């Protein structure tokens, strides 16, 4: 079982976190959505190498006050935003004929498992529904609070928008966190 990382757009924040910290921990980098090489100087692989039971880490920026989109800031400063529908369709298209395999997806996007109100749905839950709808199989894990990369598969700061802000204030603006706990993650079966 292999861990693959996908940053759909050339986003300098995620490039630093995913490529420089996590990839030496035995991960493989998939090309950006436009097909460009994910990272020069590291093993870049193609989507047809993703097999059943592999882990596919999806890196994006969650939005602080919305569960309708995730985003990436490209090198030229433009921001690309994807809805759960667009994200699921992009994954499906990239996997091509391999889309029906059981894959362990991990969404690394701040507040990916948080909803805004008790009756709202998180981005992760919306993405899981869309992924199932386009025929993707396996599981999707998303995390509450702010997430980032550290060591192998991530770190977590707080478990909500409020506790994340309190943690940052308490540590004078520094994002300090720990490994995600079981109650900080939500898993959906696809």
Q: Can you name each region flagged by the protein language model?
A:
Residues 2-117, 168-180:
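Catalytic-core segments of thiol-dependent peptidases
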Residues 104-190:
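Active-site-proximal C-terminal subdomain of hydrolase catalytic domains
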